[in-house]
Swiss-Prot record:
Keywords: Cell inner membrane, Cell membrane, Ion transport, Membrane, Potassium, Potassium transport, Symport, Transmembrane, Transmembrane helix, Transport. Pfam families: K_trans, K_trans_C. Its main location: membrane. It is found in: Cell inner membrane. One of its GO terms (cellular component) is plasma membrane. It comes from Thermosynechococcus vestitus (strain NIES-2133 / IAM M-273 / BP-1). This is Probable potassium transport system protein Kup. GO terms for molecular function: potassium ion transmembrane transporter activity; symporter activity. It comes from the Bacteria. Belongs to the HAK/KUP transporter (TC 2.A.72) family. It catalyses: K(+)(in) + H(+)(in) = K(+)(out) + H(+)(out). The chain crosses the membrane at residues 14-34, 45-65, 107-127, 141-161, 173-193, 216-236, 251-271, 293-313, 341-361, 370-390, 398-418, 423-443.
Length: 625
């Protein structure tokens, strides 16, 4: 592990950038979180004791989860400066000696967390933009009929412009979110001064007392309180973009105070106006400022949605490199910032799903039942992995782990029980969506293992010396063959010898490997050797955030091995495999069918690795699994 940004004072620009990317989701929670606790579904009376109790739970939830868990401890668990569920899983698998049983568990944890993140990626844009546009109803109830159409237009526009990248637009995200958080704090402060008794909610006893007074509603209420904590995972996931200190300082200096003040202000307002629970956030503002506030909140929710969409792109790219998803087309939208990527198929799948959610649920209050469960599951998975990190890498004692991590885990499981009670009211959606994603991730991973076993069995029948002793003609030029495993003869090479009976003067086997690190230095990416039959074997190892540069690898090997590459024709031989599902053991038949479909629809290697198509030769190979 490395200490990101250690020894360097955090840049104000990085702190501003963190506001626009890291805290968009957390920052827009005041639009719906506190109001949702007094939804008639929960049968919670608007009394001072209940208001203090709910506020106490929200405020102390912000202290325990974003502040203690993420800002204080989780940010220490960086994988070469990167955070998030896949980097954390890779960190545990690479740095901690675990039995095969526990390694499988960690992989399952990681896949569940990733699957739930995708579920969250569809709900966040829908509920955020809906809740912002609903503010128009404060101006006039008749405007309520425009909520869904306007939301659809905004979301379509947001996803439509993804292919252009977010670099230029992203430069204004930070200042807009700075204005948003200042507005949150100001609106809350005004009403706190009008009703200072609301500060009683700072006492955690009110939260405890709520449990005693509302035992039948406790877990339902916890399932709603979690709405105020959604987005906390981004503090850890976006660590690689901004560093530890900018994220921490933005939280302590602006985000946490602004959120606390706004929630207290909402409590003060409802304490004074017990019947004003509808569109509570917008009622904090004077009537003349409601429209500007709707516009500002819409911008804030679009920014929050953008952060989640970008996160889905990054998650997908990492999943592809780590072998949990098939190759997909990935466009780099900024040559100077390689992390700025666009994945068309993910973008349009997200858009279709988000629009279906908006048109099905139609109100943010209806979507609130679906929200929270996906985020909560990701939080629990992160905590379980962090317990392993604390025990094995930080060398914490059992007592320390019990006091900190087990306590946090118990709280998150209590939230999880509360969210589980919302399954009939929309909570089924993230479970269903996440279940499908988990099935795809697991099926692809398991299918790849099965495919490699079949390839190894087929490969065991051949040896290079025997293949080359069968009257092979040498032809000028360079041939590059891709090997799925080190020390394995590429099947495309075997096919070429068997059908064409030729061997190029310079023949190269190249294997692309992915390390459990986000980035691998260029000096450590290449290993190479010359076999005793004169064939060059190259292993190119890149990080799961890196894009392998084949041209640079070949140029480096040319210098190191004195390969005469210049001026000679080069051909890339690719094996186009057709997967034939069978009823043999290893995986259920329906999973094999799904795997074959995924394999068939993966982006071809020519496009993915940006190979010149006129230099590519494809050889068809059928593989039964």
């Amino acid at each position: 592990m490395t200490k990101a940004n250690a020894g360097h004072p955090p840049s104000r620009l990085l702190m501003l950038g963190a506001l626009g990317v890291v805290y968009g989701d957390l920052g827009t929670s005041p639009l719906y979180a506190f109001e949702e606790t007094f939804n008639p579904l929960h049968v919670l009376a608007v009394t001072p004791a209940n208001i203090y109790g709910i506020l106490s739970l929200i405020l102390w939830g912000l202290v325990l989860i974003p502040t203690l868990k993420y800002a204080t401890f989780a940010l220490r668990a960086d994988n070469d400066g990167e955070g998030g569920i896949f980097p954390l899983m890779a960190l545990v698998l690479s740095r901690i000696r675990l039995s095969s049983h526990w390694r499988r568990r960690v992989i399952i944890f990681g896949l569940v967390g990733a699957a739930m993140f995708y579920g969250d990626s569809t709900i966040t844009p829908a509920i955020s933009v809906l809740s912002a546009i609903e503010g128009l109803e404060v101006l006039s109830p008749q405007l309520g009929s425009w909520t869904v159409p306007l939301t659809v237009v905004i979301l379509v526009g947001l996803f439509w412009f993804q292919h252009r990248g977010t670099t230029q637009v992203g430069q204004v995200f930070g200042p807009i979110m700075f204005l948003w958080f200042m507005t949150l704090g100001l609106l809350g402060t005004i009403h706190i001064f009008e009703q200072p008794t609301i500060l009683n909610a700072l006492n955690p006893w009110w939260g405890v007392q709520l449990f005693y007074s509302q035992p039948a509603q406790v877990f339902f209420l916890l399932g709603v309180v979690i709405l105020a904590l959604t987005g906390a995972e981004a503090m850890y996931a976006d660590m690689g973009h901004f560093g530890i200190q900018p994220i921490r300082l933005a939280w302590y200096r602006l985000v946490f105070p602004a959120l606390a003040l706004n929630y207290l202000g909402q409590g003060a307002f409802i304490l004074k106006h017990p019947t004003a629970t509808h569109h509570l956030f917008f009622q904090l503002a004077p009537e003349w400022s409601v429209l500007p506030l709707v516009i500002l909140s819409t911008l804030a929710t679009v920014i929050a949605s953008q952060a989640v969409i970008s996160g889905a792109f990054s998650m997908t790219a990492a999943a592809i490199k780590l072998g949990y998803l098939p190759r997909l087309r990935i466009d780099v939208t900024d040559d100077y910032h390689r992390g700025q990527i666009y994945i068309p198929v993910i973008n349009w799948l997200l858009l279709v799903t988000v629009l279906l959610l908006v048109m099905t649920f139609r109100k943010s209050s209806e979507l609130a039942g679906a929200y929270g469960l996906a985020v909560n599951l990701t939080m629990v998975v992160t905590t379980l992995c962090l317990i392993l990190v604390a025990r094995h890498l930080w060398r914490w004692s059992i007592v320390q782990i019990s006091l900190v991590w087990v306590s946090i885990l118990v709280i998150e499981i209590a939230f999880l029980i509360g969210n589980a009670l919302k399954i009939p009211y929309g909570g089924w959606y993230p479970l269903a969506f996440g279940g499908v994603v988990y099935m795809l991730l697991g099926t692809w991973r398991q299918g790849q293992v099965l495919l490699r076993q079949q390839l190894l069995q087929a490969n065991a029948r051949f040896s290079l010396k025997e293949l080359l002793s069968q009257g092979v003609a040498r032809v000028p030029g360079i041939a590059v063959f891709f090997s799925p495993l080190p020390d394995m003869i590429p099947l495309s090479f075997i096919q070429n010898l068997q059908h064409n009976h030729v061997l190029h003067q310079q023949t190269i086997f190249i294997h692309l490997a992915t390390a459990n690190l986000p980035h691998v230095p260029l000096s450590e990416q290449l290993t190479y050797r010359v076999t005793d039959v004169g064939i060059y074997e190259i292993i190119l190892t890149s990080g799961f955030r890196d894009r392998p540069d084949l041209r640079l690898a070949l140029e480096t090997c040319q210098q190191a091995l004195n390969l005469p590459l210049n001026g000679q024709p080069m051909s890339f031989f690719l094996g186009r495999r057709t997967i034939i599902p069978t009823h043999a053991r290893g995986m259920t038949y329906w999973q094999k069918v799904v795997f074959a479909w995924l394999y068939r629809n993966a982006e071809d290697a020519t496009s993915y690795f940006r190979l010149p198509s006129e230099q590519v030769v494809e050889l068809g190979i059928q593989v039964e699994i």
